[in-house]
Each structure stands twice: as structure tokens, then as C-alpha cells.
Amino acid sequence: LLLKAKTDGRWHTQEHLEKNVYKEYGSILAASKGLTVSDNGNESVPMDMSGHKYSGTTAMMLNIASHNQGYEVPVFLNLATMNANGIRVNENAVAIPVITKNGVENVYNIDQTDYPMKHPQEYSNMKLNQVLESRLSSENKDAIESLVNNNRFTTKTSFDSSVGSASYSAIDNTIHVAPVGEYDKKDGFLQDLSEGLVMRTRKSEPVSSRFENILKEGLIVHLGSGLVGQKYGYDVGETAGSKFWKERLKNDPNYTKAVIKAAERSSDKIIDYVDKLQKGQSQSSNLDMRSTTPIDIDVDGNGIVESDENLAPDKKQGADEEKDNNQEESHHQHRHFHR
């Protein structure tokens, strides 16, 4: 099938197109067994036909989709590329909508097209290149761990927890993880550590004991850890709470968008923090979210849009702020999520 892009009509407004993207992202996440999954330690970031690599959430979603569908080569083509090169999509193939700098576009994996049949040698070379190309160097993979071991983070790390039970204590500004020797793989330790760092960025969020809010916060931590893992080349697997939020992800694109945007803010802050530390630039201890601009969606159904929730701690000024914060922190000393 030779496809043509349709760009007019009520179902092709930017808002509607983006809603479809997050609906698809929710379905991809709900079907996943992990956020970053590599084969024998080697994995290439999804890319387009010209070799340009996707990044961030888009790369994560295409990576998960490749594993969910069993695609052998993580190369994705948009309609313009396929039409320009006379590539036809297979019958019944379903596109994945993604958000790019040019807006929303539909992409197909190269395995969904006639390219492998028309150009077997070129396709074989693509597969070989994917096997040979390690997604990230081991030096990059060890970036976060080396900074912790050398006490370069302003946030303290205490190795007194159990595997899969990372937590963050706001009272003493400490991330708690298990000793690295207790993990079967180093990736598990790095996942716990990055989850603790994401919790650290979320410390100024209002604490709520509502079950749905706790699950949402756990999902944000999980996705944020996945984005950090994608950057530094370690696997992030499933979480124990996934069965509770998978149905919500499949059916509520606003919820999916809210948690993804929150995870992006946290992971971007951590990656920027690590990058500057690696370059020897001094960093403050303010690894939190107060300077970010969240989206205006009430995903919890509590009558408060997300931006008001995120900024709520900043609305208390003067002497009452310290009192309120101390009461909050004494009641919720740890943000603690289990896998």
C-alpha cells in the first residue's frame, strides 16, 4: 500500500493528533514488560532511514514497540520517506504516531514495509549494524554510579535498603538503596538509584495518601527512571504496581500525558545535573521541581489541576512554610516504591 498523508478535517487538529499520540503511548506502556530492554547488552536507539536517532520519550516508545512486536531492526519510516523512496507498507500494518519537532507524524517500522524484500542486502546490513553497535558506551553506563561512589552528589546515598525498594527521605536528604553487591545485575542497582533520584526531584510535590495518587507518583518515578536509564544505557524492568495503572494508561490519554510530562521534567533535571557534574561544574542541592512549569490537567479528579498541585508548596510563605513542611516530612519521611 502506498500511503498518502491527510492533514485536514476535524480529526487532524494538533490537539486531537497529540491526544492520539498519548493514547498510543499509553497502550505501548500497558503492553510493555519493561521500559528499556536490551539484547545481550547491545541495543541501538531507534532511528529514521537517514540514521538520525530519536531521543527521550519518542525513543523509549519506539524501543518498547519494537520489542513488543518483535521487530528486528529499530528503523522507522514516515510517509514522506516511504513515498520518496517507493517503499510500500504491508497490508494491515498499523502506524505509530509520534511527536517530533515538526509536529505529529505517523511512522512504520521497516519490518512493516516491503523494504526487506526489495532490498535484502541493504536490510541485512542494517541488521548487522544493529548487532554491532552498542547503544551506549560502558563509560556512559557507569556515569551515575561513579558520581555516587565519589560522593559527587549533594544528595546523600545510604546503602541500607533492600533490592527493588528505593526510597528518598526528605528529612535528612538521603536516597536509600540496597548495597550494589546484593543485586543480580548492576542494572538493577542503577534502576533503584535513578528511582531514588527521581523521588528527590519530586520532593516538593504535595504528599497525598490517596491510593491513586500514590500509584501515579510511582509511575512517574518508574518512567523517569526509564528515561534516565535510556540515556545512560541500563535496563529498567517492570514494577510491582504496573497492574494497577495499566488499565488507566490504555484508556486515559490525559493521564498518560500528565505522567510522561512529569517524568520528562524529572529525568531532564537529573541528566542535566549529571552532565554538569561530569564536566566539573558545581551544583546546588536544589534538585527539585519548583522551577519547572507543569501542565494544567486535573488527572486525579480532585479538583486541582496538576500545575496548582506542583506549585502548592510555594504558596506557603514565611514562618508557616517551615512548620507545614516539617509536619509533612515527619508524616511522610520516605517516598518508597517497591518493584
Language model feature labels by segment:
Residues 1-4, 8, 289-293, 297-302, ...:
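Non-Sec secretion/translocation targeting segments of pathogen effectors
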Residues 1-294:
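N-terminal accessory/interface modules of nucleic-acid-binding and processing proteins
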Residues 304-306:
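Generic structural signal for well-ordered beta-strand positions
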